Every structure is written in C-alpha cells, then in structure tokens.
Amino acid sequence: MNIQAILSEKVSQALIAAGAPADSEAHIRQSAKAQFGDYQANGVMAAAKKVGMPPRQLAEKVVNLLNLQGIASKVEIAGPGFINIFLDKAWIAANIETALKDEKLGVTPAKPQTIVVDYSAPNVAKQMHVGHLRSTIIGDAAVRTLEFLGHKVIRANHVGDWGTQFGMLIAYLEKVQNENASDMALSDLEAFYREAKKHYDEDEEFAIRARGYVVKLQGGDEYCRTMWRKLVDITMAQNQQTYDRLNVTLTKDSVMGESLYNDLLPSIVADLKQQGLAVESDGATVVYLDEYKNKEGEPMGVIIQKQDGGYLYTTTDIACAKYRYETLHADRILYYIDSRQHQHLMQAWTIVRKAGYVPESVSLEHHMFGMMLGKDSKPFKTRAGGTVRLTDLLDEAIERANTLIREKNPDMPEDELKKVVSAVGIGAVKYADLSKSRTTDYIFDWDNMLAFEGNTAPYMQYAYTRVASIFKRAEIDESSLTLPVILNEDREQTLATRLLQFEETITTVAREGTPHVMCAYLYDLAGLFSCFYEHCQILNAESEELRQSRLKLALLTAKTLKQGLNTLGIETVERM
C-alpha cells in the first residue's frame, strides 16, 4: 500500500473540483514534524497562482471537498496554504494487519515491465578491481528491487570481451607457445596482458601481427576464436567467484559482452548512411550532432567507423540499445555506468533516437555514480599507489569482521561464526557504498563501515537480530498472534506509520535507482523501533491485547528490515 499515492489521488481530485487546472498536482510529502501531521499537501500554492486565487482560500475549498473518511482523523490548513493530514489510528492498524498477512508486506505489485539493467561490466583478461564495485552492487540492488515489485528483469553484464587487446594477447600467447590457456590462473593472464602491452608498444612487428589477429578474430578465424573463448571463460569463471562472495545475482547467463553486437555493426553504419545521419569525413564515417558543439561552436562529429574500417564504443552502444529494444523487447533500459561516461552515452542515445532504433516510449536511463575515494579524498589505491583488486578488498573485509565478531562472541561455534563473519564483512563493504547517494563520490573508511553505531551494515544487521530475538527468546510463533493491532501510544503509531511507508520507499528506489533511500528508511525504522522498545513493554505488557499488538509491530519490523536489506543484497543473521 502506497499512502503517498492514495493521498495524492484524493487531494488532486479535490484540487480539480475546487477549480484548479486538470494537471494540478497535490505534491504530497511525509511531514518532517509530528505537529504538521503525517503527510503534507504542498500543491495548493502553485495551483492558486494558476487560477488567480489566494492560496489559503483555495486550500479551504480543497479541504471542504476532500474525502478522506476512514483514512484521516484530522485535516488542517497551515501557513499560506499547506494542508496537513493526520492519519486515522484504526486505518493504520488495519493496514498493519494486511501487511503482516502478505508475503510482500503489503506492497502492491507494479504493472510489469521488461527492464534491462546493464551493470558490472568487467574486462576480460583482467581481475575485477574496486572500480567495478559500485556498478556491480548498485546495479544488483536495482535488479532485486525491480524483481520484488514484479518486473521481468534482464541482467546485462556488458563485458569488455572484444578489441585490440585480444590481438595482443593471442600474439603473445603464441610467442611464448602457451596455447593451453585454460590452465592459467587469471593472475597469469594479467601478467600476460602487461607483457603483451609492452611488446605491442615497443615492437612494431609484434604490433602488426597483433592487429592482424584482431582482423582474423573479427573474421571468425577458428584458432583465434578458440583462444579468445578460453580467455573469456577463464576470466568469467574467476569473476563468478567474486559475484558469489558479494551475494550478487549475476551469473554466466547474464553475460552480454561487446562481442554480441559485432554482426550488427556493418548494417547499422550502412543504415545510418542511408538515413542521411552519417557521412564520410576523411575516410571515416561520422554522425554530426547539432545537440553537441565543438570548441568552434560547430556540430560535434561522433565517429562510428574509423578509416581502417574498425568500429568504436559508440557504434557498439548504438547496436546494444537497438538490440535491447528489438530483441529483448525492453520497456525500460537502465545503465549503471560511472559519471565520466555520461556524454558518450548521451551521444550514442541521441543517434539511437534520431535513427528510430528505440522509440521515445522506451526509457533510456543513465544511473551514473561517483568514485570511491580513500581517506585522502583521492581515488582509492593500495599503499603502493596501485589499483586495489576486489578480491583483496573482500579478503580484508572478512579478516576485519572476523576479529570484530570473535571479540563479541568468543564461544560462537565455528560454522556459525563463518556465516556471521561473511554476512557482516561483505555486508559492511556493500552497505557503506549503497547508503551514500550514488551520484556523489564517497570516502571508503573501514572503521566507519564496521561500526555497530550509525547507518552501517553491522548496526542494521544487529537491529534485525535484536527484533527477531524477541520471538526466539519467548518461543512465540506468529500464528499465535490472533488479537488485533491497537495503537494507544504515540510511539506505537509512529512506528506503525513508518512501517506502512515501505512501499513508498521501494517505489522510489525502483523509479530513481537510489538504494541510499532504502538504507535511510531502514536506519530510521530501526531507530523508531529502538525508541518503541525502550518505552513500550512488549512481553510484559499490561494486557494480552497490548502484548500481541506490540508483538505484531515487532514482527512486521523484523520482516521489513529483512526484506529491505534483501533488496540491497545484504544478508541477515539470527545472532551476532
């Protein structure tokens, strides 16, 4: 149930009935302070301006026409024309009951769409590094959220599995006569990559041979294809181990690398020429875009085919968007790629729209993100200044969590300890990232992310175990809770109202790709429960009716925390 949507519809109807234009919006917001009610309608001022009426006068007309019977106990006008809405206790209680009986916690399924989510995108023959973390975990949180709401989600891991580097690798592997590539570890491949690059830069004969292998590979040469496939398979097998450790839902079936679009590129270039969008310029094929200007103020030229016949990332991205609409039948396409790629993507999509490959009805969205920084506010590096491998980062997270949990639970059985350490260590790394707005850079800090205070994974995981332990300790089965929810105390009502705002939260995350909104909601919910727990007796409540009612609030809190963390890919544990 989406309270915001319900109130928005009701207030908008009243606004229009009061004489406001048909496109008037209620602008319903959760109230910042209890004195302003549970929700506030802020749309009257804008509507009043359009109809030339004093805002307060329009607000009075709206309130008189507003039918919130059974939903609100009180509606007030404040200031110049704000409408404060106080929800009815009985209505809140009834909806808590409904949410408890529903495996989706009262969340209304969305109208299903086919949504392609492009995320992670590591490169072949290279180990994943911290630069891949944000795309991987933010994208996966989006996928989990969209699937929870009932959408058909297609995971697209746009792996860098094509290009000049494969000519270099194949040429160098041949040079050292190591054709049995499948026996190599990925660390060996990285060493090969460095050596191949060195030879490519310093040995012109080697570079010519490498470029020749690229042509052969693109032409379908069997030997080159076999070597290429081995390199891809070794890389993705290693990456899958990282995905599994991260509790990320990507699999081998999610791989849709650059190579997938190779066969589409010639026809796309030909079609863009035929449509008059692309022209020849100094032997290359270029699309000039009026929307983007160069330094001279002239339309910017976007190259889609080089003089030597080679294609560029833009060409692949055009083909990629076309494929996702025409073949995958996407209604919405989300890209979790860092902010530095924004102009590149916008140019590719401008061409896609002009060519008619993807209609305006299909949303193309770049959910960009900032960088992960060290405490010095510079890009996160090793002490030696090198790139931090993702496996090394996760190893350190486990090591630090192990020390932390052992100190708190010296007698915990080893098998249980291992599960808790993994959940806390990996969860801490993920939550530290997901709890920050994805559009900004953030500081990576071990001490903060592993703290049991503040908006951290350990705090949230502990908050869940604390609530769940109430039922475990008292050996209470939820089926025994047969009495209705009653809300006598303010803290009970505040907690109950916040619980009912889960759908508003998850809908926002799905619409905007902002998992930090879910983190903020869960953190606030945990704080409200803590306040409720300290001031309202649960197991020793003064009556059985009150005891069961408060247990129901605790139960829905536990379920909401668990489900919310699950949409973020954060595991919960029963004991910490």
Swiss-Prot record:
The record ties this protein, via InterPro entries, to: aa-tRNA-synth_I_CS, Arg-tRNA-ligase, Arg-tRNA-synth_N, Arg-tRNA-synth_N_sf, ArgRS_core, DALR_anticod-bd, Rossmann-like_a/b/a_fold, tRNAsynth_Ia_anticodon-bd
Cellular localisation: Cytoplasm
Provide one Gene Ontology biological process annotation.
arginyl-tRNA aminoacylation
Residues forming the motif 'HIGH' region are 122-132
Per the record, the domain of life is: Bacteria
> EC?
6.1.1.19
Q: How does it assemble?
A: Monomer.
Q: What is this protein called?
A: Arginine--tRNA ligase
List the source organism.
Answer: Photorhabdus laumondii subsp. laumondii (strain DSM 15139 / CIP 105565 / TT01)
Q: Which gene name belongs to this protein? A: argS
